[in-house]
UniProtKB/Swiss-Prot annotation:
Species lineage: Bacteria, Pseudomonadati, Pseudomonadota, Gammaproteobacteria, Pasteurellales
This protein's encoding gene: oppC
Main location: membrane
Gene Ontology terms for molecular function: peptidoglycan peptide transmembrane transporter activity
Membrane topology, as annotated: Multi-pass membrane protein
Species the sequence originates in: Haemophilus influenzae (strain ATCC 51907 / DSM 11121 / KW20 / Rd)
Protein name per Swiss-Prot or TrEMBL: Oligopeptide transport system permease protein OppC
Length: 311
């Protein structure tokens, strides 16, 4: 026999469960909408999208271009030394004083420069984010000691550090990674620390503390995910600075070693022969400047897309 008194209650329970499910779905959608909104705003930025497309073509060029030519970055064409750009011999960007093809060397140099920029940014972002989050969340004497250590590193003469590494270990591309990674994370660590100081007083962090969640999990699962937007913007703006810095080191002769090259080293060689062989300076400078502009516009687009004031 059916108990009709239970039908309204069961119906209410069903309605309540349905409402809860709808609310959970809405909350999930709201959680995703932050990044979806940022994505939509980014792709509405024409300069950022155009820069992203151009940068993709540059990456494709430096990746596949050397495969389509019958010589490497160190091969010498004795019959085409200091040759201007020509279709003859497939030297579309010309050759240098040693008869080496500039197009292939520009592509290989682009690989080195982009690798230094992206790898250096990854190292600095990883160290800076973790260091800043720990310092800001733990606080107290630990925070004070970590910030004093940061100030000591910031006051250290960076060029002296690079020259010391080169003197002790010789010119090596890995030394550039070490040198850049040793100093580039300092600024981000301060920024992440400031964000962490404001985040650790939020309700969701306090709730995690009340539930007995360990500090490490709070930092990794609650603090760091909430600063990823800031970190992404910082990384996109850090890459061009690191590329430019590597080019500066190579221009001074402290970067890549012959016959390997980078855009900075090519600029140094081109500047020395600018009057007689201007193409040696024009092509590397064009790719370097174009890449720097692309990264800057992409960084500006990310910053605008993730800016909560504009939502």
């Amino acid at each position: 026999m059916t108990d009709y008194r239970t039908q309204p209650i069961n119906q209410k329970n069903a309605d309540f469960v349905e409402q809860v499910a709808d609310r959970i779905e809405e909350m999930q959608l709201e959680g995703r909408s932050l990044w979806q909104d940022a994505k939509r705003r980014f792709f509405r930025n024409k300069a950022a999208v155009a820069s992203l497309i151009i940068l993709a073509f540059i990456i494709i060029f430096i990746t596949v271009a050397p495969w389509f030519f019958p010589f490497t970055y160190e091969d010498t064409d004795w019959n085409m030394m200091s040759a201007a750009p020509t279709m003859e011999g497939y030297h579309f960007f010309g050759t240098d004083a040693s008869g080496r093809d500039l197009l292939v060397r520009t592509a290989i140099g682009g690989r080195i420069s982009l690798l230094v920029g992206i790898a250096g940014a990854f190292i600095s972002v990883t160290i800076g984010t973790i260091y800043g989050a720990i310092s800001g969340y733990v606080g107290g004497k630990t925070d004070m000691l970590m910030m004093r250590f940061l100030e000591i590193l910031s006051s250290f003469p960076f060029m002296f550090f690079v020259i010391l590494l080169v003197t002790l270990f010789g010119q090596n591309i890995f030394l550039i990674f070490i040198a850049i990674g040793a100093i580039a994370w300092l600024g981000l660590a301060r920024i992440v620390r400031g964000q962490t100081l404001s985040l650790k007083n939020k309700e969701f962090v306090e709730a995690a503390i009340v539930c007995g969640v360990p500090r490490r999990q709070i930092i990794l699962k609650h603090i760091i995910p909430n600063v990823l937007g800031l970190v992404a913007v910082y990384a996109s703006l850090e890459v061009p600075g690191l590329i430019l810095f590597e080019s500066f080191l190579s221009f001074l002769g402290l970067g890549t070693q012959e016959p390997m090259s980078s855009w900075g080293a090519l600029l140094s060689d081109g500047a020395a022969q600018m009057e007689v062989s201007p193409w040696l300076l024009i092509f590397p400078a064009f790719f370097l400047c174009l890449t720097l502009f692309c990264f800057n516009f992409i960084g500006d687009g990310l910053r605008d897309a993730l800016d909560p004031k504009d939502r």
